[in-house]
């Protein structure tokens, strides 16, 4: 497993990351209690300091005298951040993404560019899906009575795929409507093709519903307003998460404990320089040990694991010896 590999790397190169050689992996219960204890101390310290930003955060998310919701948010963000190669860089960047002033700054935000790429891709998939259905209506034994409606679908999907902004995608997806299919009474062609065309069309409709739920639950204008209002809370959540991370790391070091996320991050630090992103000598040495690297259940890999395995692959030499097998539909990281 990736964990056993990381453990092997650390056992043999612990001195490169200033780690005591007699470390041990904490059990789940022990680490859970330690997290709770450390987080309680972090929150107590912040209650005592009573900074306005912290008190506003508490007022916004705590329930009466119960701050369990706050603790849950901090721990959830902490765990999520550990799936990224450099959590202490990722967390502040995540908070900065809320620095939205208006709809224009929302459109130009870095995360929005990635989102637009996803929307463009799924829209092009809809074009391909609809095109396949329309093509079936053109077959000699195909359901030609559906051709007009399918041609309309195809035209609309192409218009959506040509959208250049989030606002355009929002308007085009939210306003999308479909013509009714003509009656198939008296059809004497291929029944399988008729059913397939209807199935493909429904698949497209279902995909559009999912896209609207996932991306267009509110207008870009309201989204920008909400992000602007949420920015101070996001910044405070990130600050508390980083403070917890530092305290928890220090306590684990004091007890000479590591968890499974630590194994991955320690191995990553042995292989890759955080500041430059360049592969270290140790990783280059490991490259010569593997003719091929094969990853099964790739959909369950996180970015830390992928960075580790790419570091010991020979891609930089132009030798592509890294192979993955997986099913994205089963991914446990489909957040």
Show where each model-derived region lies.
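Conserved P-loop NTPase-based nucleic-acid remodeling module centered on helicase motor cores
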Residues: 2-56, 107-114
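Preference for short coil/turn "hinge" residues that link or interrupt alpha-helices
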Residues: 3, 12, 16-18, 174, ...
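Conserved helicase NTPase motor core
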Residues: 7, 23-36, 69, 204, ...
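Alpha-helix boundary/capping residues
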Residues: 9-13, 38, 164, 173, ...
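Conserved NTP-handling cores and scaffolds of large molecular machines
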Residues: 13-17, 39-50, 65, 78-85, ...
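Conserved ATP-driven helicase/translocase motor core recognized via long
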Residues: 37, 68-258
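Alpha-helical transmembrane helix bundles of large polytopic membrane transport and channel proteins
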Residues: 51, 56-67
């Amino acid at each position: 497993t990736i964990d056993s590999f990381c453990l092997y790397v650390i056992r043999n190169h612990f001195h490169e990351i200033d780690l005591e050689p007699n470390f041990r992996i904490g059990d789940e219960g022990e680490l859970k209690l330690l997290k709770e204890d450390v987080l309680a101390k972090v929150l107590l310290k912040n209650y005592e300091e009573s900074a306005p930003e912290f008190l506003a955060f508490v007022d916004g998310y705590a329930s009466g005298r119960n701050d369990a919701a706050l603790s849950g948010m901090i721990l959830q963000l902490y765990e999520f951040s550990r799936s990224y190669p450099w959590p202490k860089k990722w967390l502040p960047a995540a908070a900065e993404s809320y620095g939205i002033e208006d709809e224009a700054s929302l459109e130009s935000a870095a995360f929005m560019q990635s989102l637009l790429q996803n929307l463009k891709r799924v829209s092009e998939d809809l074009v391909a899906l609809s095109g396949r259905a329309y093509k079936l209506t053109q077959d000699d034994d195909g359901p030609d009575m559906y051709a007009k409606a399918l041609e309309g679908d195809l035209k609309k999907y192409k218009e959506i795929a040509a959208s250049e902004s989030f606002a355009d995608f929002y308007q085009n997806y939210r306003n999308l409507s479909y013509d009714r299919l003509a009656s198939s009474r008296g059809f004497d062609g291929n029944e399988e093709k008729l059913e397939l065309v209807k199935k493909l069309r429904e698949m497209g409709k279902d995909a559009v519903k999912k896209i609207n739920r996932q991306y267009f639950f509110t207008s870009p204008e309201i989204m920008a307003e909400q992000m602007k209002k949420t920015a101070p809370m996001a910044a405070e959540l990130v600050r508390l998460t980083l403070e917890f991370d530092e305290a928890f790391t220090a306590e684990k070091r004091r007890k000479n404990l590591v968890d499974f996320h630590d194994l991955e991050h320690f191995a990553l630090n042995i292989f890759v320089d955080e500041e430059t992103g360049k592969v270290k000598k140790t990783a280059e040495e490991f490259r010569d040990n593997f003719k091929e690297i094969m990853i099964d259940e790739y959909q369950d890999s996180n970015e830390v694991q992928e960075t580790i395995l790419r570091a010991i692959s020979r891609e930089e030499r132009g030798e592509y010896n890294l192979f993955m097998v997986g099913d994205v539909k089963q991914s446990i990281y489909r957040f």
